[in-house]
Amino acid sequence: MHPRHAGSLRIGLVSDTHGLLRPEASAFLAGSDHIVHAGDICDPRILDALRALAPLTAVRGNNDHGAWAERLRGSESLQLGGIMLHVLHDLAALAIDPAAAGVQVVVSGHSHQPRVSRRDGVLYVNPGSAGPRRFRLPIAAAELRIQGRDVTALVREFAA
């Protein structure tokens, strides 16, 4: 169970599952108000499993193929709790100026490296990979906490 403050939203962030949604990642995402998957899903059953936990926004990654993947967009912008998020798989493909577009949070994946940074007033979050281990990179997911106009990000690494 995740502690919740009155009036706050918890947004679960996941990426690069590559056909494997680890139980510890599912447990971490449970209780989210919304889940965002930043691509490289590789199996549509993962989307079903995430939708069973919370409303879902997902984008297509470079390894997502087939009719199910064609229904996903390469990027999505959405507003949650008054905060504008922009989601895409590979940050190198970012085609907007987030600050100029009024985006407060950019969520991406692709690198399998969890990272949280802030540039020009925009919070950038890569939740890392919640799928099969790649090289020596950690298995991870992340969350956004939205409380009014304040947004914080937390990366959670799993022992898997």
Task: Please provide the spans of the model-predicted regions.
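Active-site environment of divalent metal-dependent phosphoester hydrolases
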Residues: 19-23, 42-46, 63-69, 92-97, ...
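Charged helix-capping and loop-helix junction motifs
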Residues: 72-75, 102, 108
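Hydrophobic/aromatic beta-strand patches that form the interior of the parallel beta-sheet core
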Residues: 12, 36, 57-59, 105-107, ...
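Core catalytic region of metal-dependent phosphoesterases/phosphodiesterases
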Residues: 1-84
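Binuclear metal-dependent phosphoesterase catalytic core
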Residues: 2-8, 77-81, 118, 125-160
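Short coil/turn connectors at secondary-structure junctions
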Residues: 83, 102, 120-121
